[in-house]
Amino acid sequence: MIEALIVGEMQDVQIGFVKQILSLNLVPRSNNTTCGNNTSLCDFSEMWYGVFLWAVVSSLIFHLPAALLALATLRRHKVARFFPLGILLMGIIGPLFGGVLTSAAIAGVYKAAGKSMFSLEALVFGVGQSLFIFIISFLRILATL
């Protein structure tokens, strides 16, 4: 009888603990820190990497079709057949140099504000960087015409 009471009290304590944890919405991370939920990026390196990764991927998504189009149209040209390589290199080198700094600045602002970043925010900031570069590049070309 006493054992049944002890087991019942332990189950009540465990249920109360689970409710408390779920109400706080804290999920333990791999490095023993806690974060708002499992898709939140709390650490500076997580935020930086998330934004940087989306910037690189979206830059390649913009540059790969341009390189394929250049390859298809310039394949018989004597010198310009190598332009697609330059386009692909700029699709990789641009985010490696510029994207590293801007992603670090975004992650630094979030970390200094004490906020966590959702994965969707990292996507928006990463793709936003590539869109911004695309728009600026397009406007520079229009200015030369």
UniProtKB/Swiss-Prot annotation:
One of its GO terms (cellular component) is nuclear envelope. The chain crosses the membrane at residues 51-71, 82-102, 118-138. Keywords: Endoplasmic reticulum, Glycoprotein, Membrane, Nucleus, Transmembrane, Transmembrane helix. It comes from the Eukaryota. GO terms for biological process: endoplasmic reticulum tubular network organization. Residues 1-50, 103-117 are lumenal. Signal peptide: none annotated. The keyword Transferase does not apply. Glycans are attached at N31, N37. InterPro entries: Transmembrane_pr_170. It is a multi-pass membrane protein. Coiled coil: none annotated. It is found in: Endoplasmic reticulum membrane; Nucleus envelope. Residues 72-81, 139-145 are cytoplasmic. May regulate membrane morphogenesis in the endoplasmic reticulum (ER) by promoting ER sheet formation at the expense of ER tubules. Belongs to the TMEM170 family. This is Transmembrane protein 170A. It comes from Danio rerio (Zebrafish). The gene is tmem170a.
